[in-house]
Amino acid sequence: MRRLLDAWSGIPAYVRNGRFDVVAANKLAMALAPLYQPGRNLVRDMFLDPAVRVVFPDWPEIAAQTVAALRASTDSRNAELAASLNGSDEFRRLWALHDVRPARDETKRFLHPYAGMLVLRRQSLAVAGSDLVIIAYQPEPGSPSADSLADLA
């Protein structure tokens, strides 16, 4: 999978497991957002890393989607992850809603300190026989986001 991620040098891409841990990422994904570093946990960082709120201008919606995806996950370790986040008022509030829906491919806005606002389409690919998912973000061809992403690469 490492070679695949590296071959996609023009689009940010990373791999996460069923516990929402980032297990691999290409350079552009790591440049796009701090939470796409291998070893980071996407759910934990969504609520405990203040820098993530800056990266996602639509943080309230993305946080709600993240909690709903955590509830939809079948990984038994996620109950422990949810319990570890009870110190976050926002997480507790969203968890109490009992919204359950898997992560979906959609357009997300990223605010990068050098590249500015990037509008990217999320695409996910499940890795057969594992709990791994490859996530890639693509700009609309010819858009300002495509130009900014190319500069970031």
Describe the residue ranges of each PLM region:
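Hydrophobic protein-protein interaction segments
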Residues: R2-A153
